[in-house]
Amino acid sequence: MSERIILDDAAIQRTITRIAHEILEYNKGTKDLVLLGIKTRGAFLAHRIQDKINSIEQQLVPTGTIDITHFRDDVDKVVQQADQRAFDINVDINNKVVVIIDDVLYTGRTVRASLDAILLHTRPIKIGLAALVDRGHRELPIRADFVGKNIPTARDESVSVYLEEIDDRNAVVIE
């Protein structure tokens, strides 16, 4: 199957810059702002957005990773109970404005799992959602506050995000 490039390296960089500016406008600066990237590619994107915000505001926004593995609705409930804290960040996110970062927003189930993981032990002031790509086909009533690119797709198509940190290239492709 051939791939169709939707975003190349330069387009991804511009998109991250725009999302960073939108997050700053949404939050009116960096006060109480925390970024949580959904493992794996969302975490790398969160750090890229953190770097961009730092270059704009000269403020290092606390950034961490959230692993939703044990909060997915397609795993055994016994496994779900084993996980106490699914996020890795060095600040308390209670009473903070948390922005969840994901690479592709599709059915909404990954985002729902991340909300479950966050709200199990903490109470942020507000939670926002940023996605590099929104491909539609939602199964839950979830919408991103910040979207890099809306890509209408067929259900049988696959949207892949490649990031140089793990894939040795930057691209968003439909396969």
Swiss-Prot record:
<comment type="function">
    <text>Also displays a weak uracil phosphoribosyltransferase activity which is not physiologically significant.</text>
</comment>
<dbReference type="InterPro" id="IPR050137">
    <property type="entry name" value="PyrR_bifunctional"/>
</dbReference>
<keyword id="KW-0328">Glycosyltransferase</keyword>
<feature type="binding site">
    <location>
        <begin position="102"/>
        <end position="110"/>
    </location>
    <ligand>
        <name>substrate</name>
    </ligand>
</feature>
<comment type="subunit">
    <text>Homodimer and homohexamer; in equilibrium.</text>
</comment>
<comment type="similarity">
    <text>Belongs to the purine/pyrimidine phosphoribosyltransferase family. PyrR subfamily.</text>
</comment>
<dbReference type="GO" id="GO:0006353">
    <property type="term" value="P:DNA-templated transcription termination"/>
</dbReference>
<feature type="short sequence motif" description="PRPP-binding">
    <location>
        <begin position="98"/>
        <end position="110"/>
    </location>
</feature>
<feature type="binding site">
    <location>
        <begin position="40"/>
        <end position="41"/>
    </location>
    <ligand>
        <name>substrate</name>
    </ligand>
</feature>
<feature type="binding site">
    <location>
        <position position="85"/>
    </location>
    <ligand>
        <name>substrate</name>
    </ligand>
</feature>
<dbReference type="GO" id="GO:0003723">
    <property type="term" value="F:RNA binding"/>
</dbReference>
<dbReference type="GO" id="GO:0004845">
    <property type="term" value="F:uracil phosphoribosyltransferase activity"/>
</dbReference>
<dbReference type="InterPro" id="IPR023050">
    <property type="entry name" value="PyrR"/>
</dbReference>
<keyword id="KW-0806">Transcription termination</keyword>
<dbReference type="Pfam" id="PF00156">
    <property type="entry name" value="Pribosyltran"/>
</dbReference>
<dbReference type="InterPro" id="IPR029057">
    <property type="entry name" value="PRTase-like"/>
</dbReference>
<dbReference type="InterPro" id="IPR000836">
    <property type="entry name" value="PRibTrfase_dom"/>
</dbReference>
<feature type="binding site">
    <location>
        <position position="135"/>
    </location>
    <ligand>
        <name>substrate</name>
    </ligand>
</feature>
<keyword id="KW-0808">Transferase</keyword>
<feature type="binding site">
    <location>
        <position position="159"/>
    </location>
    <ligand>
        <name>substrate</name>
    </ligand>
</feature>
<keyword id="KW-0805">Transcription regulation</keyword>
<protein>
    <recommendedName>
        <fullName>Bifunctional protein PyrR</fullName>
        <ecNumber>2.4.2.9</ecNumber>
    </recommendedName>
</protein>
<comment type="function">
    <text>Regulates transcriptional attenuation of the pyrimidine nucleotide (pyr) operon by binding in a uridine-dependent manner to specific sites on pyr mRNA. This disrupts an antiterminator hairpin in the RNA and favors formation of a downstream transcription terminator, leading to a reduced expression of downstream genes.</text>
</comment>
<keyword id="KW-0804">Transcription</keyword>
<keyword id="KW-0694">RNA-binding</keyword>
